[in-house]
Amino acid sequence: STAAVTTIEYEQGVLSDLRRALSVVAPDDIPYAHDRRWGDGNGRSHVKAALVGPSLSVPIAGGEPMLGTWQQVVLLELDVRRERSRTVVVTVTP
């Protein structure tokens, strides 16, 4: 629950802007109830992931995703304190 899926122009400026925006909403330097309860220090990561969301719908036309010219689907891991693996599930419905 610390990962999120979205679309973004995968470019350093936009990535920096997103990082800054999420830090305004869920700053690193405030206490989180989750951290007090579990002691794992990633409360902010759970909040950021909840705001971005765990899923995404992308329309398909002619067998291709309908994305903007520079738009890409990305998985954001918002708790980078340790290495982990993630499984991405893609479901196509007619």
Give the ranges of each region predicted by the language model.
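Active-site histidine-anchored catalytic micro-motif
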Residues: 1-94
